[in-house]
Amino acid sequence: MPLRLDIKRKLTARSDRVKSVDLHPTEPWMLASLYNGSVCVWNHETQTLVKTFEVCDLPVRAAKFVARKNWVVTGADDMQIRVFNYNTLERVHMFEAHSDYIRCIAVHPTQPFILTSSDDMLIKLWDWDKKWSCSQVFEGHTHYVMQIVINPKDNNQFASASLDRTIKVWQLGSSSPNFTLEGHEKGVNCIDYYSGGDKPYLISGADDRLVKIWDYQNKTCVQTLEGHAQNVSCASFHPELPIIITGSEDGTVRIWHSSTYRLESTLNYGMERVWCVASLRGSNNVALGYDEGSIIVKLGREEPAMSMDANGKIIWAKHSEVQQANLKAMGDTEIKDGERLPLAVKDMGSCEIYPQTIQHNPNGRFVVVCGDGEYIIYTAMALRNKSFGSAQEFAWAHDSSEYAIRESNSIVKIFKNFKEKKSFKPDFGAESIYGGFLLGVRSVNGLAFYDWENTELIRRIEIQPKHIFWSDSGELVCIATEESFFILKYLSEKVLAAQETHEGVTEDGIEDAFEVLGEIQEIVKTGLWVGDCFIYTSSVNRLNYYVGGEIVTIAHLDRTMYLLGYIPKDNRLYLGDKELNIVSYSLLVSVLEYQTAVMRRDFSMADKVLPTIPKEQRTRVAHFLEKQGFKQQALTVSTDPEHRFELALQLGELKIAYQLAVEAESEQKWKQLAELAISKCQFSLAQECLHHAQDYGGLLLLATASGNASMVNKLAEGAERDGKNNVAFMSYFLQGKLDACLELLIRTGRLPEAAFLARTYLPSQVSRVVKLWRENLSKVNQKAAESLADPTEYENLFPGLKEAFVVEEWVKETHADLWPAKQYPLVTPNEERNVMEEAKGFQPSRPTAQQEPDGKPASSPVIMASQTTHKEEKSLLELEVDLDNLELEDIDTTDINLDEDILDD
């Protein structure tokens, strides 16, 4: 069966002809040197051009990253080597390296060396620590030296390919080649070493359209690959996958199996001739250079072949080698979240196939290895072969002795105890299968669940799943798609009833088989269930768990990680990365058990589990309870004062909220509590809260609404003392203390407003205020100050002023007493009164003047409501206003509105 290899294009960068490509080891960058003399750096994640180097006007045939120095090294047809800092774009160094075009650059992985090859038939070694001096020259080729590559298993050895039809292997320190490989009929364009430890192989591609595999220890050609229709310009062993990549001037890239030499795939992106290829250890990305630009493709899946059983034994594949590690062997080693675990690795042997996936069965006794279209079931302890076969896919059932294979796109077979039990053809074909409590089969029509025992259709769902995860109880299942995931409840009792009675069974299965609990718009990469909690890694590298509609983030991961399993006794979750590093994160089983009990409404169990939850975790549990609607329990459980205060407000628990507000000493909390107290008619508590919050506006509202005159008076004094002039003014004004209002405006420099207030209510004070206004204004504008008219000097401009003096005195003598608030309905509103008419015939007991004889300002009268009563409404005097927790005070009933502009500070 063919190697299952997903190929996805990640980047297409249109440009001039690309002569070389390279991938950065840590950044998501591709380096491309162009025939027009430029070098470009592309970000293949954002698909943007991030850097450009204008090297020269001639073709740049070679360019490499030197990541440890932040360099880009280029070689061009002007025979110059140039070194650029890719962060600053500064040219660090430049020198003439050869006497003809420079074809290739190879960077030593550990030493400060680069090797260059040229059309001058020479290879040179340069040392950048010695001011880029030429340390050695390698002579021997009789034509252009097209490519050089350093042996990854022996960094002192390198190989070269030349148009003289030979491949030569060299040693640093020796100017002559170790040996020469001959076999191509035309010039050799490219060469590469196999990086695995099991084969001493070289690969070469030539103008004879052939690709040859060489054993450089035996110096023999072990395989010739035919298929390209034009010159082979690039050939490479992939450092991670068991594949060979070759590119040709025929415009195709061919992918071959490196063990069977079978052609697996042919890529043609229509960008004319292929010139170069680059890959990187630890990555599945491959860069390709063409006449019309460059492309990055992702080959295969980066998820490692790795599995862990319930006891903490981890098995993984490193290429074809299977290794094991045991978490128990760590003993009492201190483990920190997110740090790599220091595991002792044990080699278990080699696998006959290249493993793409490894998976334990539910009880952990067996492990299946899948790859190359085959599967092998081994014993987990000793890796002894138990069963094998051809299959495109494999899935374990919840019963550890049962499994299914997808033999083709139309046939699924079920095995029990390693013997075939049943074979069937799903109605709409089988593109993929999924294990668990039910056998899932994906087809073009959607997802179908079948019974393992009799392959009866349980339910067909119109969905295209990527992963399916079943809980241990079989009650819950997560179906993950490309864009979101669904949580479903499997109703096994209804399924059994429907199977017996055949009621509710349609062509799409049993209608009531599943109940949808929720859909979450997040992409699941890997996942597992612990109780009723679904733990998963997301596409944005977050480690989350979902329970009861709530998503809790356990950790933000710094790279892509894959879930292995959860060990309850350790209270830890284990994950692995593509480099086979194992990390873990703390996740308390008591928290998960509590949340599971709440979801099942088993509160007696939840109460038993609660004491085992550490205090630092209880707030997380309280948030969960709140989201489930159990706010009273959340208030009891939570240890976070902020959270408890919010819950107390929501529940109307005034005492608890008051205690928390006292402890917090927060103005915001006092304001929130005051609002709650008012809504509960607890006005004395509201008053105390507003005082703590220094909310003078709220206090004024409360005082006026309750008719509390003494409170208004105290508020006026306090507000003025604290600089809350608007509230102070309004408080004085409501009490009829117009003198205090006037003096407040004068003290705060609001002299125009003071003048208008005096003209309206205190005409006896107008002259004094105008003089103050004039003095103040003269400091800014003398002419404007002189234009102000004093009403006592220009009576003709202020008609009715003399009468106003009389009215002011009349009001003072006749309206000195306050009226009870309960008589408000009997008082004629100010807007309906004519004070001038009421004061007719009044003779003041003293002359109306601007000032008293001693020179002090005359005391201001207070304008009060009319004392006229109507006999027919006498019974209304008995009216009482019944307000809980309030004591009505005598207040001024003067209903006077003040222009808002006057109130602005």
UniProtKB/Swiss-Prot annotation:
Principal subcellular localization: cytoplasm
GO-annotated cellular components: COPI vesicle coat; cytosol; Golgi apparatus; Golgi membrane
WD repeats: 13-52, 55-94, 97-136, 140-180, 183-224, 227-266, 350-388, 390-425, 746-783
Source superkingdom: Eukaryota
Effect after changing residue 254 to C: No effect on protein abundance. Mice homozygous for that mutation do not display any developmental abnormality
Modified residues (Phosphoserine): 859
Record keyword Coiled coil present: yes
Gene Ontology molecular functions: structural molecule activity
Protein name listed in UniProt: Coatomer subunit beta'
Phylogenetic lineage: Eukaryota, Metazoa, Chordata, Craniata, Vertebrata
